[in-house]
Each structure stands twice: as structure tokens, then as C-alpha cells.
Amino acid sequence: FFKNINLSFLTLVVAMLIGDLFIGFYENMIFVYASLLLITFVFYKISKKINFKSLFIYGFVGSLIFFIISNFGVWALGSPGVYDIAYDKNFNGLLQCYILAIPFFGNTFLSTLIFAYPAIFIYKSLTVRSSSR
């Protein structure tokens, strides 16, 4: 929602770091951060085109970006201490990682929609009010 993309990136990284201070840092967090930064960049470029209908599509695309990158990180580095799953470092191992992660995608997409629609509604309401003053 910031006009400056660097401020968007900074806000995202600071919020994630604060959260990770409480939750704990983890080995493949670079993939989570990278996916969120990419999603921020993509949506920064298209933010003027967001409406109620397109948000569903953008939410799906953002969830898919997160799914692909974060699960690649799980395949590449494993998930030590969480599930202790080590995938074979070949195409079959990567495919197995993505297949086993499919049940989590639904929750990612659903939570994206649950939070995105109110956030966009509030943002649009505030920008309409401030522009009418």
C-alpha cells in the first residue's frame, strides 16, 4: 500500500524479523522471505488494477508463488526440527515435496483471501475518505 516499493520491502522484512524473533529463526526462512518479497514486487506493479474480482486471481497467484518458492526451500534444505523430512535431491524428491505440500496450499490460499479482502476494503475506504477531503 506504500507508494515507494523500498518502503514496502522494508516494512515486510521488519515485520517478518519481529515475528521471527518470537517464533524463532529457521534454516529455510530465506525462501519464505524471498517469496514474500517477490509477491510484494509483483503486486506493487499491478496494485492499481486490484478490484474485488481480480483480488481472487491475484490471491491465487500470490499463494502459488509462495507455495513454489517455500516448498523448494523445504526440498533443498529440508525441515530440520519441524518434520525432519529429507527429500532426495533429484526431480522425484522435488516432486514428492510439492505433492506432500498440496494439502497446505488450500489453507494458504484461504488465509490470503480472508485477510486480503478486508485489507483492500479498508485501504480503499481510507483512500476514498482522504481524497475527498
Residue ranges and their predicted role:
Residues 130-133:
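Membrane-interfacial, low-structure loops and terminal tails that flank and connect transmembrane helices
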Residues 2, 30-38, 110, 114:
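Membrane-embedded alpha-helical segments of multi-pass membrane proteins
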Residues 51-128:
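Membrane-embedded alpha-helical hairpins and interfacial helices in multi-pass inner-membrane proteins
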Residues 7, 11-45:
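Interfacial aromatic-anchored transmembrane helix boundaries in multi-pass membrane proteins
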Residues 1-4, 41-50, 122-127:
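Structural signal for the C-terminal ends of transmembrane alpha-helices
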Residues 1-2, 21-22, 68-69:
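Transmembrane helix irregularities
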Residues 4-12, 16, 52-63:
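Transmembrane alpha-helical segments and their boundary/interface "anchor" motifs
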